Each structure stands twice: as C-alpha cells, then as structure tokens.
Regions:
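N-proximal low-complexity "stem/linker" segments adjacent to membrane-targeting elements
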Residues: 1-25
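Short coil/turn segments at beta-strand junctions that form active-site/ligand-binding loops
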Residues: 1, 28, 111-115
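Active-site-proximal specificity loops/subdomain of glycosyltransferases
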Residues: 37-118
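Short loop->beta transition adjacent to catalytic acidic/histidine clusters or analogous donor-positioning motifs
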Residues: 3, 23-38, 57-61
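Short His-Asn-centered micro-motif
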Residues: 5-11, 33-34, 118-120
Length: 120
C-alpha cells in the first residue's frame, strides 16, 4: 500500500518543511499544486522552490496551474454590493476547487488499496 499526500501550496515554507519531515517515512509521493492566480483572481508569482526541499526532491511532484478555471463570472461596476460579493465568493470557490482538482494531473501509479490524501 502506498500513500500519496496531495495539497495546494501558496507560500507556507515553514509548514511545508514540517509536513515533509514529519510524513516523509509514510508517504510515497507528495503532490504539490501551486497556482499563478490567487483565489481572488489576482496574478501572483510562484513561491515554491525545490532547492529549499532538496532532501525530498525525489518524492515531490510539483504542478503549476497557469490558467484560470472555466466559468469565472464577470464582475461589473454596475453590480450591487451584494451581487459583487456573491460573485467574488463564487469565483474564489471555483478557483479553489479547480486548483484542488488539478492535483489529479500529478497522481500516477496509484493502485487499488493505495491512499490518496487531499488536504490543505
């Protein structure tokens, strides 16, 4: 049985270091997805640097999400405050779900009986 630890990355190097060190002996692969867009839709720089985690480089599968999800709702100046907020929340959820689902692009060699953990 293999265990795959899959999660989204923003810029939490301290937490990531703890996670990798603590779980290393149990995990077959760490699948990390980083997006070029924040959940609010603003373009962002990528922060993950494999050189900070050389000890784990053979276990890390790093994926970059370089595009927005389909179905992002346009926000208009003429929208009321409540409508704008609703659209911001909806779009944020779409980005979050899309990035999380993007993890499947890094899952390889999973057999029946293996565990795939998807978390934050």
């Amino acid at each position: 049985m293999k265990i795959f630890d899959c999660f989204m990355y923003f810029d939490e190097d301290v937490v990531l270091d703890l996670r990798l060190n603590y779980l290393n002996r149990y995990i077959e692969k760490f699948i990390i997805v980083e997006s070029m867009y924040a959940h609010n839709g603003k373009k962002r720089n990528l922060n993950f640097d494999i050189n900070n985690f050389k000890k784990f480089k053979d276990k890390i599968i790093y994926l970059v999400l370089d595009h927005e999800p389909p179905g992002i709702v346009g926000i208009n100046e003429s929208d009321s405050f409540d409508i704008k907020n609703g659209k911001y929340i909806l779009n944020s959820m779409k980005r979050d779900f899309y990035q999380r689902n993007f993890i499947q692009n890094g899952i390889k060699d999973v057999d029946n009986g293996d565990f795939v953990l998807i978390s934050d």
